[in-house]
């Protein structure tokens, strides 16, 4: 594997940023990163005999050594980011693309044929601070490209799964967000595992009550509507995933680095997550609602 990376960034220090915002300046921080990857081979582990030997550990035989097989993958990943500050308004956006090809895709495709990579993901998030930074109103919209390849027999969690490209399909388009980027509490976080083949819209609001001496309690809530970019790869072959509402209460003490809280979420699935009778005559079912209660606490040090 050969990987090369180049980047350009412009980020103000926290002190300078605070001073410029207080003066009413329009502040823009930005970054550009490009990553090039070239992988010649991949390793296919060979099946070995796990039977214990009465003579102790033995040297590997030639037929037990991992097998190096051709992969010949090349990709270029551009990543553009910027964050704008103007008085009480903050707008942040990031866009990522993956472009390249794999000459020998192996298990990624049903045929040993060159496949193209063309994937993209993006997020735009805004926040407006009101009432002396006590009331926050936000809106976030994001998306990740999807692919028409589907496998209704698999679980839906894309944090670990992949769908093999069928014969005649020589391109991969499904982009996956990092599973550590949490948009909600239920659908993307636990059902899908990450954001992929989706566009979502998320308005949110929170209010913080100052308790003095660096302590505060916040009440927050958000609503997320999500839809598929490529409906044919959803279980229900439809566009609407569903609507989720999340509310929570958080306590924080910035002086001592202590925080904790509780969050409750409720998700109402739509047609894209059901299994309609027209597609599954012997195994059709309507998706049901889901809810979650999450308690968290931590110490920063």
Language model: regions and residue ranges:
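Surface-exposed loop/turn segments flanking beta-strands in extracellular/periplasmic regions
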Residues: 51-60, 161-171, 177, 281-283
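Predominantly the C-terminal beta-signal and adjacent terminal strand-loop region
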Residues: 254-295, 300
């Amino acid at each position: 594997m050969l990987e090369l990376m180049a980047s350009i960034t412009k980020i103000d220090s926290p002190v300078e940023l605070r001073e410029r915002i207080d003066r009413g300046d329009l502040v823009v921080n930005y970054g550009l990163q490009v990553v090039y990857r070239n992988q010649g081979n991949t390793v296919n582990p060979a099946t070995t005999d796990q039977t214990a030997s009465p003579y102790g550990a033995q040297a590997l035989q030639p037929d037990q050594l991992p097998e190096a097989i051709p992969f010949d993958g090349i990709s270029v990943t551009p990543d553009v980011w910027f964050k704008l500050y103007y008085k009480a308004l903050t707008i942040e956006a990031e866009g990522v693309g993956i472009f390249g090809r794999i000459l020998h895709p192996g298990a990624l495709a049903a045929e040993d044929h060159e496949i193209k990579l063309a994937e993209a993901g993006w997020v735009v998030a805004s926040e407006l601070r009101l009432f002396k930074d006590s009331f926050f109103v936000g809106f976030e919209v994001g998306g990740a490209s999807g692919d028409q390849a589907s496998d209704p027999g698999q679980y839906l969690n894309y944090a670990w799964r992949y769908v093999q490209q069928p014969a005649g399909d020589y391109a991969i388009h499904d982009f996956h967000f990092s599973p550590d980027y949490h948009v909600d509490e239920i659908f993307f976080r636990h059902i899908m595992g990450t954001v992929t083949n989706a566009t979502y819209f998320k308005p949110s609001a929170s209010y913080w009550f100052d308790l003095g001496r660096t302590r505060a309690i916040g009440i927050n809530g958000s609503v997320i509507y999500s839809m598929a970019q490529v409906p044919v790869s959803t279980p229900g072959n439809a566009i609407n995933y569903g609507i989720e509402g999340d509310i929570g209460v958080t306590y924080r003490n910035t002086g001592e680095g202590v925080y904790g809280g509780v969050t409750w979420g409720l998700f109402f699935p739509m047609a894209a997550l059901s299994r309609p009778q027209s597609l599954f005559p012997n195994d059709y079912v309507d998706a049901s609602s889901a809810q979650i209660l999450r308690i968290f606490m931590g110490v920063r040090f």
